[in-house]
Amino acid sequence: MAEIILNVEVRDGAGTGNARATRRAGKVPGVLYGGGKAPVNIAVKANEFRKSLYTGKLLGHLVTLQYGEEKQSVIAKAVQFHPVTDEPVHFDLYRVDEHQLIKIEVPVHFKNHETSVGLKKGGTLEVIRHTVELACPADKIPEELVIDLAGHDIGDVIRISEVKLPEGVKPAMDRDFVIANVKASSAAQSDAGDTTA
């Protein structure tokens, strides 16, 4: 995965007026916090921030923050968007050590839809969790969890215990929760009802 580097500058002042002035200057205001240090108001050039954001690798990934010659590992915790233009208007970054154990949401994706027995029979994939919260070192955050649907039949339940996680990564919750299931569609159920009648 390519490393994302955000070049930031420190903002003077805080509050709504300061944030608006920052946006008028073509930058996105943000706050850097965590790591046992005081919060710092920062800003990133809007085009640079959008480029990093829309790669899909900013949220939930380790990012290098650069201020002059100084570098800091951070995780983007939140990005706020304008309700009409959908442009980023504010972001929060959290300082982390590369090997620090953190909890983070990771997206779930599914593969081999075409080889799933249940889906071939007309079943549907019901996704319960589109993201899963994982506990892992900051430098080992998986980009995604990929779940193989091959061999899953109607009625099968896919739990977190069935997912092979990378070394050093575990679910943040200590229970075997459901991620998805393959269920019979209403059409498949009515076909089954017609054949039994």
From Swiss-Prot:
Which SUPFAM superfamilies does the entry mention? Answer: Ribosomal protein L25-like
Pfam families in the record, alphabetically? Ribosomal_L25p, Ribosomal_TL5_C
* Origin: domain of life: Bacteria
The UniProt keywords, alphabetically, are: Ribonucleoprotein, Ribosomal protein, RNA-binding, rRNA-binding
One annotated GO molecular function is: 5S rRNA binding
A single GO BP term for this record reads:
translation
The record's Gene Ontology cellular component field reads: cytosolic large ribosomal subunit
Q: Kindly give the PANTHER family that the UniProt entry links to this protein.
A: RIBOSOMAL PROTEIN L25/GLN-TRNA SYNTHETASE, ANTI-CODON-BINDING DOMAIN-CONTAINING PROTEIN (PTHR33284), RIBOSOMAL PROTEIN L25_GLN-TRNA SYNTHETASE, ANTI-CODON-BINDING DOMAIN-CONTAINING PROTEIN (PTHR33284:SF1)
Q: Which family does it belong to?
A: Belongs to the bacterial ribosomal protein bL25 family. CTC subfamily.
Describe the task this protein carries out.
This is one of the proteins that binds to the 5S RNA in the ribosome where it forms part of the central protuberance.
Q: How does it assemble?
A: Part of the 50S ribosomal subunit; part of the 5S rRNA/L5/L18/L25 subcomplex. Contacts the 5S rRNA. Binds to the 5S rRNA independently of L5 and L18.
Name this polypeptide is given: Large ribosomal subunit protein bL25
